[in-house]
């Protein structure tokens, strides 16, 4: 969503690329951030080129703000190394924001790296888990997604990983996913199992007396 205000100040979208580029050199972080926001929405290669040098800035907060904004430019898809370095960082700010960028702009990074990063930081991730939608469909990734699903402790995480599995591996893995979802402690995941069962004709009897009313109702619904 395009912001109009940043930290109480209106973002100067009306300024030229040249004027905004000068703001990038300001020692004041607020000026830098305002310029990044405005430049990131300029449909102009020169705006992207003005931002690009700051991916190597010595100030980590400037690098972080560039990470959060530069990928609005289609040309930034070339900055895979920058993005992979961000999610490989020991700094969770870079990891989380890098994963969110991958999710939002569907930037393709190494599958093995993405899975290892999500696995490493899983307990601390929320919407960043959505980066898993960019994974290729293959047996190895399926096994790793199932392992992530099994290890996840938050319902929202399991729900989203479950949706990724269902989106990418049905109908070929329908029986396995039905069984995986059926025994989950979260009702929302058992609801997902019922949807799989109804689509592929699996037995719903186990859900007819489920402790959760929503699960029972969906199982009984013709």
Q: Language-model segments: which ranges?
A:
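Alpha-solenoid HEAT/Armadillo-like helical repeat scaffolds in large eukaryotic proteins
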Residues: 19-27, 50-58, 82-90, 113-121, ...
